[in-house]
Amino acid sequence: MVKAFIGLIIISLISFSFQSFASNVSDKEKVFVSHVPKKQEWSFSGPFGGYDKAQLRRGLKIYKQVCSSCHGLKYVAFRDLKALGYDQEKIKAFARQYEVSDGPNREGKFFKRAGVATDTFPSPFANEEEARFIYKGAYPPDLSLMARARTRTMPLPISDILTYYNTAGPDYITALLTGYQKAPEDMKITDGYWYNPYFIAGNSLAMAPPLSDGLVSYKDGTPETVEQYARDVSAFLMWAADPHMEIRKKTGFRVILFLIIFAGLVYVLKIWIWNSLENEFEKEMKD
């Protein structure tokens, strides 16, 4: 009797709590859930995909002319651009366009100098505090690892492993750059912020829409649209975060091929050994 009474009280409390939560959600404000980015087709998708160097060079151009005013690439060195098809002279010329901090010198002071090939892409801000002051408390993140850091939430990564889906990062970046919309009437957006349903940290962000049609010129005839810009810079950021992807895929394929051949040889050797033992055993039994 006592157990039944206690159970009834617990059920009543759970029911009341659920109704109270549902009422709060429906009457006060809706819970924001970010949209899932659409899967894109990339040259580097799948186990055998590789980077499109022309696209990477276009993405670098987008980063330099648009993104670098707010975001750094502290883990990418100028000399790494050799993988994009740049020779040593072009890399040196590209690095000289940037001003980097160095020192201390003999007088113990820090100074500015032109970049060299061994330098990394500098941050546009002296420190985090300066960035937050300029952008009303928001801090533009470094983009070096962004394409690898933005993955999907559980349990989707489990299915991604089985289907070899490894482009969630560039898919997210593309969706974010092209996903700016007018906020719904029943959704409150902080002044100076922009609504983007793909932003994983909330319903709005401090970054204004950075891309527009015709913003950056391409000499190879590639369409100069927001969608193309977003895809190009997303591919570039994927390379920045995972520059050794192609080597890893080739090495992995060779290792798997070796293991398959090795397993086949071991199996054949096993059959041969056991057949030999069976024949010897049969001879001994006859003798």
What are the language-model segments listed below?
Residues K109-P122, E128, R132, G202-L211:
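Extracytosolic (periplasmic/ER-lumenal) interhelical loops and adjacent juxtamembrane/interface segments
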Residues A138, D142-W194:
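Acidic, glycine-rich loop-and-strand cores that form catalytic or ligand-binding grooves
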Residues F199-A201, L205-D242:
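Extended, hydrophilic extramembrane loops/domains of integral membrane proteins
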Residues R248-G252, L257-D287:
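Juxtamembrane interface at the cytosolic side of transmembrane helices
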Residues V2-G50, W239-A241, V266-F281:
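Post-cleavage N-terminal segment of exported redox proteins
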Residues K61-G72, D119-A126, Y139-R148, A175, ...:
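C-type cytochrome heme c attachment motif
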Residues V36-K61, G72-Y86, K90-I91, G221-P223, ...:
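Electrostatic cytochrome c docking/interface patches
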Residues G46, Q55, V76, A83-L84, ...:
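Acidic/histidine-rich catalytic neighborhood
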